[in-house]
Amino acid sequence: MCLTGVDYFSTLGYQPGIAFLAAGLLSPIATLVLVLVTLFAALPLYRRVAGASPHGQGSIAMLERLFPRWGGKVFVLILLGFATTDFIITMTLSAADAAAHFVHNPFAPHWLQSQMLITLLLLTALSAIFLRGFKEAIGIAVVLVGIYLALNAVVTTVALGEVLRHPHLIPEWKRALFAQHPTVLGMIGISLLLFPKLALGLSGFETGVAVMPLIAGTDIRQRIRNTRKLLMTAAVIMSIFLMLTSVVTTLLIKPELFAENGPANGRAMAYLAHQYLGNAFGTVYDVSTILILAFAGASAMAGLLNLIPRYLPRLGMAPEWALASRPLVLVFMAVAFFVTYMFDADVDAQGGAYATGVLVLITSAAVAVVISLGKRKRRYAYMLITAIFIYTTALNIWERPEGLKIASFFILTMISVSLVSRAMRSTELRIMSVDLSEGALDMLAEDEDQVIRVIARRPQNETAADLDRIERAVRKRYGLDPRESVYFFEVEKGDASEFDCTLVVDGERLGNNKILKARSPVVANSIAALLIELERRTGNVPHAYFKWKDGNPVANAFRFVFLGEGDAAPLTHEVLRRAVKDPDHLPVIHVS
């Protein structure tokens, strides 16, 4: 819960201030809408997600399974763009808010008052930690979250005491509220319209699912139950704090103090801590807030380093160096610096972009749950939840389009890099292992000299006579001894959007013809992998026989990259050339 909390609970550092700037005196009512959506929409939704992805893959993996082939891969890239937006803005927003707490602390040195500079220094320190090597420390998270929640409880309790000691505050707030909004229905309607601006208070649910592999449980069912307890506990704690902090900050802090560069801007609870508990306690609160916000940035960086290598290299859509964390750290920090500069390290300005990333991920989870439920009656409730989040996301993007712009940049960058990487990596071997069935091994053992000769061909519904004719033509063309065994190898093309696979080869006879059969996303790479495996098993260099493929070479190359097929002979040779370094062990390719 505390690993989830460094992301989720740390938003208390800036959520009350952003809520007031968005909703004004309606902030408590708009926050109540947020709490209701948290408990009765997001929570049941992610309880379903936890059940569907017990290993922590979350909604992205659910949708990848639901949408096969290239459509699913493109969908994953789009969601990764929004997820990257979420994590990057978590880093920059957390660092900016930590800087705001530092700058407005009365003990801060006068020569270090630039919020931009401090934000960049915090981001630099974060990158330095990861460049040295960083492992999430559950113990640190427990200490930080425990202290932070305890301090917030103290400040909130004292602030509520101030409200009770000054009973005129609530009637004054009601008079001002009704002066602006004469009817209760009008207040509710406007709160529903304003709620999307507060949606960054929904962060943490994806993190809660992501930490599932760390949750104790004797089996998967118990882990799912414990995760659901975690989500419930975190949501209830956060809802209580969101509601109470919204009330006390609205009643006790003058509206002008929330404005840009105001003492309560981005640090409403810290302002109350200094105001009612003194600068010493307030400084302790500031330090606690700065630490948990910094750790929230570290959690976001860890999320990025877990998310990107999990998907892009596996799909062949990232360079090999993307598997290493340090180059990725430098890339992410460069982007974080740019985003910080673009938003001028302003906490409020980044709220919309952050909410966009959070809302798109939650909406994608809602869609995944609805689709996974099929025709069950329960899906109607989740369809309503999905409609709520679609509305919330659309309104947030309409009013604060900067989040969509940043996400679009990430999406276009990922798609561009992915296409280039997929093309450049297409002639890698891509076959993780070759599994020869007993039938295939028995047929191969019949070759007396164990110099295996393979005729590579596309699977077709041909008779034994057709195969006999093809074999005679190949033997005549290449002058093969009639006693030499020849095998047909047929590769049935599978999902071409997959990058790598295990090649399972079966043996089959049709008349006197021996046929090796396999299914794979890529034809040429599978032929190369089989030849390498045959050389390893027999100790002799195998031979493969091809027929030239007619057609445009550029079109053939395109078909190979995206459809897994093309002119197999030169492509197989190129895959072998890259995979086999010793020319004495290089299988021989014949083509005519």
Predicted features and spans:
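Extracellular/periplasmic helix-exit of transmembrane alpha-helices
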Residues: 157-170, 220, 233-269
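Cytosolic C-terminal regulatory domains/tails of membrane transporters and channels
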Residues: 429-592
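Extracellular loop-to-transmembrane helix junctions
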Residues: 16-64, 71-76, 92-122, 147, ...
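Membrane-interface "cap" regions at the ends of multi-pass membrane proteins
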Residues: 1-14, 63-65, 69-77, 188
